Amino acid sequence: MANGADGFECDVRLSADGVPVVIHDATLDRTTDASGPVSARTADELARVDARCRFTPAEATFAAPAPVGVPMLREVIAHFTTARLIIELKDESVRLARLVAALVVELGALDRVCVGSFHQPVLDAVRAAVPAVTTSASRREAQWTLARSWVRWPVPARPVYRAFQVPERAGRLRVTTPAFVRRVHREHAVVQVWTVDAPDDIQRLFALGVDGIISDRPDLAVRARDAFVNTR
């Protein structure tokens, strides 16, 4: 955020005591000084591991000066009061979906949070629990929209998704074509492309009409975005 990003994406799982916590991996081994499943530890126990110990300044644009535990999602939403958040639900858990949907409402973050998941039942659970929560398209929904961009197909009457978080390519298939971007906009949703770090690629995608870039290099991405805006 200090680099000027509008927001960030975070991955969420359930702790052993049923608290949504922010961590990508299912285990602690790769990114902390602990080991074992995230789901085997309580939120308090996860807060006491060192989640910055496996990173060096050469690997990241931010290096914490002191140990940082695995935070609760509640803490992240409450701390970053102006940031737009993409919350990806990693666990295939309807319980997690309902807890996160309720938390977004409780913290008054409906206008700045988008919830996503690769698991269709999880997204369905979010939408059923709190229809007002913004969700991104599932993989299946994105595939159908990409297919509809190839032919003249009616726009869905009431799409339940508001965003598409997609890669530029999936294998040999290019996803973010001009036709796909136009199609998504016709469905009153936005296109956010991951993970793009090269400034030239970022500016090219903005020129294509995408609405957002998800990057591991927010410093470079912000400069590329600002340079693109200044040329319009």
State where each predicted segment sits.
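Active-site-proximal loop/turn and secondary-structure-junction residues that shape catalytic pockets
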Residues: 14, 91-93, 121-122, 139-141, ...
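Hydrophobic packing residues within well-ordered alpha-helices of enzyme cores
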Residues: 18, 100, 123-126, 205, ...
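C-terminal active-site rim and adjoining tail of enzyme catalytic domains
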Residues: 146-232
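Metal-dependent phosphodiesterase/phospholipase catalytic core, i.e.
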Residues: 24-129, 157-187
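Catalytic domains of carbohydrate-active enzymes, especially glycoside hydrolases
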Residues: 1-14, 159
